[in-house]
């Protein structure tokens, strides 16, 4: 199945009822989840980091892209990639991360507003949701 077909399948999943998208941490768990009948997979930043003996947020974009490519190659399911905070402070950094993920075979992805440079904080009611942040590739 081509990446374009996987992306179309992933997009179609979003048009129907909510679905569960599990997080494989390696190629073996991706195959098990595929065999269990899930319709798509999503990378897990913390799960992948832990397989490397690191904390969440301590994995480079290059490592995430290599991990994404390995998962996309081992399964016929669409793979959505966790791109952390976009791997840089600028919108161009996020655009580069998305382009690299697409080139690695990702069918979708997510970018969170997260900052690993300081201690963990709690969110309060002042956080809003911005519109128009959806992208597909």
Regions found by a protein language model. Give the residues of each.
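Glycine-rich anion/phosphate-binding loops
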Residues: 22-27, 59-65, 86-103
